[in-house]
Regions:
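The feature marks the mature, well-folded catalytic cores of soluble enzymes
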Residues: 1-193
Length: 193
């Protein structure tokens, strides 16, 4: 199934790119903006930290994956958290944050549906934008029947599966004491992500 995904990913990307019009010009512009940001990273990080702090946030820096994971666990423990709701984040995937927090005694639940599915299956994401693209509807159905203690029920349609995930995840959202999200971009001038 992953081989099929590898075949179709470039096709899906090319179809999406076609919708953008002057793709190459946009690509070059983004490349210049990114390089400018990297060339001036110290300034932008300091500015972001100042603005984020002014917004009531606390900014932490880490030199390694272990240090980042330790900082997050410490924050969770300081707040007496037992349950964590975690949004999709490639950084936390790369640092192994979920496993680290679980070893620290926390229950971590992914909030992105695809990430949730692969988490429940004990697998790793197959694709950055579609973590569970390699799973069939029947595989997800069997997984939910096995993992969710919701009694007898019909899980025949995709909407049945999504509805069940919504019920389980909503319960976790309401019980979680800490939420963790990632950010693809930081707005230095505003201190937002």
């Amino acid at each position: 199934q992953r081989d099929i995904l590898a075949l179709f990913t470039p096709i899906m990307r090319d179809a999406a790119v076609a919708e953008f019009g002057p793709y190459e010009a946009l690509r070059q512009h983004v490349k210049r903006v990114r390089q400018h940001s990297l060339d001036n990273l110290d300034y932008y990080l300091a500015r972001f930290e100042l603005e984020a702090t002014n917004n009531g946030n606390q900014v932490h820096y880490a030199d390694s994956a272990d240090e980042m994971n330790s900082i997050v666990l410490d924050i969770c423990q300081q707040h007496g958290a037992r349950k964590v709701a975690k949004g999709k984040s490639m950084v936390t995937e790369e640092t192994g944050l979920n496993d680290y927090l679980q070893r620290g005694g926390l229950q971590v639940m992914e909030t992105d549906l695809g990430e949730y599915i692969v988490q429940q299956a004990g697998e790793t994401p197959s694709h950055i934008a579609g973590p569970a693209l390699h799973k069939t509807r029947d595989q997800i159905r069997e997984l939910f029947l096995d993992k969710h203690d919701l009694g007898e029920r019909e899980l025949e349609s995709i909407s049945d599966l999504v509805g069940e995930a919504r019920v389980v995840l909503r319960d976790h959202f309401l019980q979680a004491e800490v939420g963790i999200i990632g950010s693809n971009a930081l707005i230095a001038e505003k201190g937002y992500s």
